[in-house]
Amino acid sequence: LTPNKLDVLSGDQYTAYLSDMISTVKNNTSSSLRSYTFLDKSPSNYYRKVFDNNTDWQKDMYRTAMTQNYKISVEGGDEIGMYDLSLGYTKSESTGKGTDFDRLNLRFNTDIKVFSKVNTELDIAYSQNSYHIMDNGWSESYDMQNIGSTNVLGLIQAPFISPYAYYYDENATDAYSSDRLRLSHEYAGKYAANGGTLMQNPFNFSNMINTGSNIMNEALRNPYWILQNGEGNNKNYAQTTQINLNVKPTYQVTKTFSISDRFNFNMNRGNEKYFLPVSGTTNYYLQDLGYVTSVQKTFFSKATTLQNDLRLNWENTYGAHHVNVFGGWRYNNYSYSYNYMQGYNNENDKLPILSKNMKYINYGGSNDNWIDMTYYFDANYNYKNRYFADFTVSSMAGSRFGDSTKDGFQLCGVSWGVFPSLQLGWVISSEPWFKTSKGINYLKLTAGVDQSGNDDLDYYAARTYWESVKVTHNTVGL
């Protein structure tokens, strides 16, 4: 893949544009014009090298990307068993530097005849997806951090500033250290302040506009510094892993009667890390908290599912009559856990470790587990594949049900729901008197009545519980 860049103003064009905008500002004086240091192109201007550049911010943030796919598959078998083994690997680069993807997947399927009346189906699958992924695109909100997307910064960063420019600030404060990279503390935002009044003004921007009770964050970060300091498996990285095991032994007791048990295990695991480095940073003010520079976030989740379906099946055909009856017990066990953590102002990009020394730490998580089981029975009949009848009934209990439900019944201290169903069908087009046409070659009429339920209940809906919560990032309460 070859990237295409968007056309934006050059440094000279941007300077000319801002000069035109300055001419529209009322009450400009020679003294006020001197505050726009980028207008002065004379060699004696101390800031000339800072603002006399033609920087193409997109130039070194993209690359020609390549995608690779590899697959090996082996299959075979005999009258005893059949098997299929496949292994695949994919690696894909993004046209944006710092972002790529790779996937490893393995799968094994087999059907084995263990004994003369016992056969087993086995399916094992493993998949792992890994991502080096930089912040990309616009965020829905920047209430909690500055813009960290390199492709966005490559479009909106001022083109007359050099990516490597430093200059000494005689008015340095604790908030602005004199040796800090000053690429976007000026001329890189949307608004300015004049006498405490905000005005739209695309040329006089500061790192932070303080208008009394309102503070606006306008300074932009250096995208190249984010690329250089943001890559790594312990920084902007995500990984998902999935494991699936499915086994089904079947015992054919007679020609018409069989017993089977299907067991399934599934696990999904996810791990995400986000890192916005301190190098090349600008101060950012969080409402009611304070100033932040770097941002670090982690998220881990794990979901497992255990399922078992024990089934007895009887099926026979008597002339034009076909009967199938089966019933069994189904068990599901679900668990889901996650935890997250977020902190600010890590002072060393080489050690991206979340610790208690970071500012405004926020964390949380959950660990949920729920179970349900169902007894079910199904009987279906058809005559000449023309007339159909099907009756089904199931009884289900779940850990998310309350102890005193209005419907169903109580057994063994839990609530059970009963869900019957009756369905009838008639294939009209199979009748001797029905004449098919080009417009209709199959016509079936079905009717039925059933009672269904809903197990999509909130995990805590049937419980009374206490929960600790953080207040203003400093206090814990109930």
Give residue ranges: language-model regions.
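Surface-exposed, extracytoplasmic segments of Gram-negative outer-membrane nutrient-acquisition systems
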Residues: 32-50, 276-285, 290, 471-478
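Acidic, Ser/Thr-rich peripheral helices and adjacent loops at domain boundaries
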Residues: 139-150, 469
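Juxtamembrane/interface motifs at transmembrane-helix termini
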Residues: 140-142, 280-282, 344-346
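Transmembrane beta-barrel wall of Gram-negative outer-membrane proteins
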Residues: 59-133, 149, 154, 158-169, ...
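Short, glycine/acidic-rich hinge or "gate" loops at secondary-structure transitions
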Residues: 134-141, 278-279, 434-440
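Residues embedded in well-ordered regular secondary structure
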Residues: 1-97, 136-138, 166-218, 223-236, ...
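Extracellular/periplasmic, surface-exposed regions of secreted and cell-surface proteins
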Residues: 103, 109-118, 124-128, 198, ...
